[in-house]
Amino acid sequence: MKPAARRRARECAVQALYSWQLSKNDIADVEHQFLSEQDVKDVDITYFRELLAGVATQAEKLDQLMAPFLSRQIEELGQVEKAILRLAMFELSKREDVPYKVAINEAIELAKVFGAEDSHKFVNGVLDKAAPSVRKGKK
């Protein structure tokens, strides 16, 4: 699958995760609604589904994994930043086929598009500190 299709999958996953975090609806319902309402023709749907399901089912573990690297409590994070960081932590911890630099860069780009003005700097700082611990030296 093309890298652009994976990037689009991440973009869609962040949007769907944001919706899920706010609505607290079942993730399968969020996925169905998202796929029926959004243009997903250039999206790696398989990867989108994996990211969405993986983050949703492991959100608590992902939060625990990132907590030591945050400068504030998870509850104080904006919903967009939380969705982006959860997605990146999922890729870092569960998708070793994705190089850690790619996971970090993609998260930074997502924060630039969807986050507040300086959220990309915050995301970069958290993931730069977290990646060596999560990947245990693997590139």
Swiss-Prot record:
GO terms for molecular function: RNA binding. Gene3D superfamilies: NusB-like. The keyword Transcription applies. Signal peptide: none annotated. Keywords: RNA-binding, Transcription, Transcription antitermination, Transcription regulation. One of its GO terms (cellular component) is cytosol. One of its GO terms (biological process) is DNA-templated transcription termination. SUPFAM superfamilies: NusB-like. Involved in transcription antitermination. Required for transcription of ribosomal RNA (rRNA) genes. Binds specifically to the boxA antiterminator sequence of the ribosomal RNA (rrn) operons. Belongs to the NusB family. NCBIfam families: nusB. This is Transcription antitermination protein NusB.
